[in-house]
Amino acid sequence: MKEAIKKKAIRRLQILEGQIRGLQKMVQEEKYCIDILHQSLAVKEALSGVENLILENHLETHAVEQMKKGQSIKAVREILSIYKLSRKRS
């Protein structure tokens, strides 16, 4: 993994960790449901950002290497499988 992307991903995951702890506390304290949902959506968005970083890394490293080695079909299949999974979540 590229060092710059790794650092960004770890930092964002640390922030997410705090957000999830906050979300858990909100549920334990029976905060207003809409406020909990807003926080939950913020967590989802932040996690999506981490996924984007990981995908960026994959495309810039692994996918490029696969294509250089004549494994472009494998690279395309991997990317399509992730794309299909992301569409199911939407």
Question: How would you name each of these model-derived features?
Answer:
Residues M1-S90:
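Solvent-exposed interaction patches of small proteins and small membrane subunits
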